Amino acid sequence: MKLLIQGNNIAVTESIHDYVESKLEKATKHFQTFATKVDVHLSVANNARITDKHKAEVTVYANGTVIRAQEGSENLYASIDLVSDKIARQLRKYKEKNFGKKTHVQEKTSEVLPEDPVPDNLIGDRAPELPSEVVRMKYFAMPPMTIDEALEQLQLVDHDFYMFLNKDTNAINVIYIRNHGGYGVIQPRLGKE
């Protein structure tokens, strides 16, 4: 398994490198068969107003799946401990879900929500403000998947949303975590309405 450690506003010393390597080796030792690459990004915020100055982000690439975790604290070593525990839990969950014994079939349900029109006064007289320029572009592979598979990926990447190619409709969809609990899916609709 390939391990890449990068630092932002911090020099990655040999002791930090060894500590990260030992913690992640311990966290990923049972998952060596499907984890191919691990990226670690350590950063220190030089801002007095930020309480959790030391942040550790770990991204594990496993069988075409991205599993990501990030933690921050006042101590770099504590952040590394927290993120390694979190990534170990996520890897265990991924392994149990995809490689565990399936003894029973769980019935999957879904609910179709009514399509209510958006009120005209939602934005008011404000004009939406967009950034003046694109500062970063990302490209990634987008294999077709079901909404349930996209939900699983959303939970693994530790983000608020996940964009995917819907296997059923062959359209790009976004699944997101709702503020009031649960998940939502944004699907494109052709036409003006």
UniProtKB/Swiss-Prot annotation:
Native organism: Picosynechococcus sp. (strain ATCC 27264 / PCC 7002 / PR-6)
One annotated GO biological process: negative regulation of translational elongation
One matching Pfam family: Ribosomal_S30AE
Record carries keyword Cytoplasm: yes
Subcellular location: Cytoplasm
Alphabetic keyword roster: Cytoplasm, Translation regulation
Induction remarks: Is repressed by light, since the transcript is synthesized in the dark, but upon 20 minutes of illumination, transcript levels fall below detectable limits. This light-repressed transcript is present only in dark-adapted cells. Is rapidly translated at the onset of illumination; in fact, is one of the first proteins to be synthesized upon illumination of dark-adapted cells. Repression of the transcript in the light requires protein synthesis, which suggests that a specific protein is directly involved in lrtA light repression.
Name of the featured protein: Ribosome hibernation promotion factor
Residues spanning the signal sequence: none
Family: Belongs to the HPF/YfiA ribosome-associated protein family. Long HPF subfamily.
Subunit structure: Interacts with 100S ribosomes.
GO cellular component, one term: cytosolic small ribosomal subunit
Predominant location: cytoplasm
Function as written in the Swiss-Prot or TrEMBL entry: Might modulate either transcription and/or translation. Required for dimerization of active 70S ribosomes into 100S ribosomes in stationary phase; 100S ribosomes are translationally inactive and sometimes present during exponential growth.
Other information: The transcript for lrtA is more stable in the dark than in the light: a 3-hour half-life is estimated in the dark, whereas a 4-minute half-life is observed in the light.
Disruption phenotype: Knockout mutants grown in continuous light appear to be the same as wild-type, showing no differences in growth or photosynthetic activity.
Cytoplasm found in the keyword field: yes
CDD domains per the UniProt record, alphabetical: RaiA
UniProt cross-references to SUPFAM superfamilies, sorted A to Z: Ribosome binding protein Y (YfiA homologue)
